[in-house]
């Protein structure tokens, strides 16, 4: 398990009490809202802390508030983000992933795959990568077995797609 930092423990427990005090299991919330077939599928996709975080985030989103995921490295922030992206897709929204590190595009895509988002919801849209940095592509695998599956758009193509898009929708195919 993960130890909740002392300064966040009280607030975290109070937020979770709202669910558990009403006899609501966060796994049931995630199963329902992310449209998983069973609790076992949820448990295979996420760790317990991630399930709690996703349930709390959904609660905040439903009342028009934000949610910050700020755990230590290796706790699964990307997996939580992938879960929220799945929720967004279920709500008919377009998920947006912004990162200061271009290498995280591959990480978030791996998390999207690992939570079954590509299987259950059909095809995930082609990522609209605006970063033209050297590492901004999406890779599957590591090292010599690595294969590029998505590349960023060229700057000219990106500008053209954005300028031509006046409807508020992403360009066709994205």
Task: Label each region the model flagged.
Residues 31-35, 51, 66, 86:
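A generic structural signal for ordered alpha-helices
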Residues 43-65:
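N-terminal pre-P-loop "Q-motif" helix
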Residues 1-16:
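Intrinsically disordered, low-structural-confidence terminal and linker regions
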Residues 64-84:
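Walker A/P-loop
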Residues 14-45, 78, 89-174:
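SF2 helicase/translocase NTPase motor core
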Residues 55, 83-87:
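Active-site signature of alpha/beta-hydrolase-fold catalytic machinery across serine-
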